[in-house]
């Protein structure tokens, strides 16, 4: 059986920014031990001759072919813009000179 210490549970809780009581710490340690023991069962599985799985579903190239299509005219796209400049949307700067 995998032993999970109180310190390990407290460390994990701290990483997750969780505050847990001593009772919850003990309960969480038991839960984590059960999870780790369950996962350890995979070590005893006979995988001889089984090809590794890279994806849970056997999907290949589910994307469509790229096709160039006519978009909306630039004038129409910019028609309702508050401000434009040189045929592009003009938006307020979000970075000051120090960040740029």
Swiss-Prot record:
InterPro entries assigned: Asp/Glu-ADT_sf_sub_c, GatC
Q: Which reaction does it catalyse?
A: L-glutamyl-tRNA(Gln) + L-glutamine + ATP + H2O = L-glutaminyl-tRNA(Gln) + L-glutamate + ADP + phosphate + H(+); L-aspartyl-tRNA(Asn) + L-glutamine + ATP + H2O = L-asparaginyl-tRNA(Asn) + L-glutamate + ADP + phosphate + 2 H(+)
- EC number annotated for this UniProt entry: 6.3.5.-
Name the top EC class.
ligase
Domain of life here?
Bacteria
Family that this chain belongs to: Belongs to the GatC family.
Protein name in the entry: Aspartyl/glutamyl-tRNA(Asn/Gln) amidotransferase subunit C
Q: Which organism is it from?
A: Staphylococcus epidermidis (strain ATCC 35984 / DSM 28319 / BCRC 17069 / CCUG 31568 / BM 3577 / RP62A)
- Which gene name belongs to this protein? gatC
């Amino acid at each position: 059986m995998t032993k999970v210490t109180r310190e390990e549970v407290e460390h994990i809780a701290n990483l997750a920014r969780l505050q847990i009581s001593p009772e919850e710490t003990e309960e969480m340690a038991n839960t984590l031990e059960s999870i780790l023991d369950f996962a350890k069962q995979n070590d005893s599985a006979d995988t001889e001759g089984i090809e590794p799985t890279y994806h849970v579903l056997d999907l290949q190239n589910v994307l469509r072919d790229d096709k160039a299509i006519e978009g909306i005219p630039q004038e129409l796209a910019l028609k309702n813009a508050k401000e434009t400049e040189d045929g592009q949307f003009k938006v307020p700067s979000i970075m000051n000179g120090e960040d740029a």
